[in-house]
Amino acid sequence: MAPSRKFFVGGNWKMNGRKKCLGELICTLNAAKLPADTEVVCAPPTAYIDFARQKLDPKIAVAAQNCYKVTNGAFTGEISPGMIKDLGATWVVLGHSERRHIFGESDELIGQKVNHALSEGLGVIACIGEKLDEREAGITEKVVFEQTKAIADNVKDWCKVVLAYEPVWAIGTGKTATPQQAQEVHEKLRGWLKCNVSEGVAQCTRIIYGGSVTGATCKELASQPDVDGFLVGGASLKPEFVDIINAKQ
């Protein structure tokens, strides 16, 4: 990892938890020794964004797990970037594979969401990744490059974008891409940014890995030169999340 890219660890709590158990998790995080050279962001369920922001140590940022592509309107069940900011969150996760595959979000819609979230001042954790059949068909690059292009076409300033590579076959399955597999895709993604955006953006943009990251797998993954952090699912709800945050130490 280049010295200019601060290590980044995001915890995606998904649709999990109630105030009691999330409060206990927050107490664990607040009491832990977290490295100053690692940026930490937690993404609670929408209903608990305000609760998390009030309880978490200020050095831990809060993200929403989704937002819509416009400011206001008749969009039942949606949340806008302005509302997210109003609750004290500063980041949003967009393009997660569960949004793509369960809720049918297209590359085009995700790009529009990224554009609007950035224009409203939120940082964006933009997710990309291939399914198992796509990896086995040898089209991983094609898939992730197309997904990245849909995002890149909507980004003017990359300073507030973190790209999260999450191989769908490794999410919640217990399977993890090997450090070498993760590094290979991250390196190719950085190469795509260099060729299609700019060398400066390629060097400065953090590309993080998501896909069954655990306390046991994080250190070797973190040692790869193009792995700039993690987007953690299930393990972010457990005390081992602290070990993952400390993976570079």
Curated annotation (Swiss-Prot):
Matches recorded under InterPro entries: Aldolase_TIM (IPR013785), TIM_sf (IPR035990), TrioseP_Isoase_bac/euk (IPR022896), Triosephosphate_isomerase (IPR000652), Triosephosphate_isomerase_AS (IPR020861)
Superkingdom of source: Eukaryota
GO cellular component: cytosol
Disulfide bonds: none
Cross-link (Glycyl lysine isopeptide (Lys-Gly) (interchain with G-Cter in SUMO1)) at residue(s): K142
Modified residues (N6-acetyllysine): K14, K156, K194, K238
GO molecular function: isomerase activity; methylglyoxal synthase activity; protein homodimerization activity; triose-phosphate isomerase activity; ubiquitin protein ligase binding
Residues where Phosphoserine is found: S80, S106, S198, S212, S223
EC numbers, comma separated: 5.3.1.1, 4.2.3.3
UniProt keyword list: Acetylation, Cytoplasm, Gluconeogenesis, Glycolysis, Isomerase, Isopeptide bond, Lyase, Methylation, Nitration, Phosphoprotein, Ubl conjugation
Catalytic reaction(s) noted: dihydroxyacetone phosphate = methylglyoxal + phosphate; D-glyceraldehyde 3-phosphate = dihydroxyacetone phosphate
Catalytic residues of the enzyme: H96 (electrophile), E166 (proton acceptor)
Listed pathway(s): Carbohydrate degradation; glycolysis; D-glyceraldehyde 3-phosphate from glycerone phosphate: step 1/1; Carbohydrate biosynthesis; gluconeogenesis
Complex formation: Homodimer.
NCBIfam families assigned to the protein according to its UniProt record, in alphabetical order: tim
Function text: Triosephosphate isomerase is an extremely efficient metabolic enzyme that catalyzes the interconversion between dihydroxyacetone phosphate (DHAP) and D-glyceraldehyde-3-phosphate (G3P) in glycolysis and gluconeogenesis. It is also responsible for the non-negligible production of methylglyoxal a reactive cytotoxic side-product that modifies and can alter proteins, DNA and lipids.
PANTHER family, per database record: TRIOSEPHOSPHATE ISOMERASE (PTHR21139:SF2)
Entry similarity comment: Belongs to the triosephosphate isomerase family.
Protein's UniProt name: Triosephosphate isomerase
Source organism of the structure: Rattus norvegicus
